Amino acid sequence: MKILFTFPGQGAQRPNMLAAIPDREAILSQARAVLGDEVETLDSADALKHTRAVQLCLLIAGVAWARELQRQGVNPQMVSGLSIGAFPAAVIAGALDFASALRLVALRGDLMEQAYPEGYGLTAIMGLTRQRLEALMQGHEVYLANLNAETQIVIAGRDEAMAEVAQLALQAGASKAQRLAVSVPSHCALLDKPAATLAKAFANLALTRPQCAYLSGSTARVLWEPQQIADDLAMNMARTVHWQEAMVAADERDARLA
C-alpha cells in the first residue's frame, strides 16, 4: 500500500488556523522572509475575507502539517491537492520550493480577487448527478467547477445565477445547496485570463522532477514532468476539478490516505 497526502482547497480555512501548526516559528519565519509583516495577521478573521490570505494560509498550514508527518517518519508515495491544495502538494513532492510557492500563491490570490472582487463565487449542490444538474444549469451563467463525488458537485458563477440554480436543484430533489466561503468563481472559464497571467510567472521558474507521484486534481493524472506540473499549478484555477476521478486514480494505484 502507498501513502497518499491530500491538501484541501478554499473553504477549509478558519481564523487563527496558523496558531497551532507544527514548528510554527520556523515556518512562519520562512514565510515572513517572502511576505514580510503580512504574516503576522494572515489568519485573522478580517484577513481571511480576502482570497490572497486564505490561499496563503492553506499553503502554509498544508506544508507545516505534512512536514510534521514526515518528521514522524510518514512519507508519501503520492500527493494530490484540490485547487490551491496543489501548491503545498507540489512543495511536499519536491517539485516546487516553499519560497517560490509563497510568491506564486500570493500572486494567484491577488489575480483571482482582482478579476472578481464581489458578486461571484461557488455553491455546492448535493444529491443530484452531473447530468441532472447540467440540465438545470441551461440558460444560467454558471459553470461546473468541482466534481467531488457522484452527487456532490460545485458550481461557479454570479451569486444571483447560482442562487437560481440552487433553488431549481432543491426543487428537483437535491438534498442540499450551500453557498461556499469562496468569493471568486474558481475552476471555470471566467478565470482564463488570470490563469494565463499566472502562467507567465512560471516562465522564469524552474520546477524539478517530484520525488513522489504528483496526482493532478484537475486531470486525475499522475504528472512527473516539471513543465506539466507548472502548467497544472498555473491553470488549475480555470479548470474543472475532477476530484472523484483523482481519488479513483489514487485507489487504482493502491494509494491510501495517511
Could you tell me what each predicted segment is?
Residues 1-80, 155:
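Helix-rich "cap/lid" substructures immediately adjacent to catalytic or cofactor-binding pockets
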Residues 3, 74, 174-175, 255:
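Short phosphate-binding/catalytic loops that engage adenosine nucleotides
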Residues 11, 37, 93-238:
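Alpha/beta catalytic cores of group-transfer enzymes, especially the acyltransferase/condensing modules
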Residues 29-30, 60, 64, 86, ...:
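A broad detector of short, well-ordered amphipathic alpha-helices
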Residues 40-48, 88, 176-180:
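A short small-residue
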Residues 45-46, 80-84, 109, 120-124:
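Short, glycine/charge-rich beta-strand/loop segments that flank catalytic centers
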Residues 61-79, 235-258:
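Flexible, low-complexity segments
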Residues 62, 77, 81-85, 89, ...:
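Gly/Ala-rich beta-loop-alpha elbow adjacent to hydrolase catalytic centers
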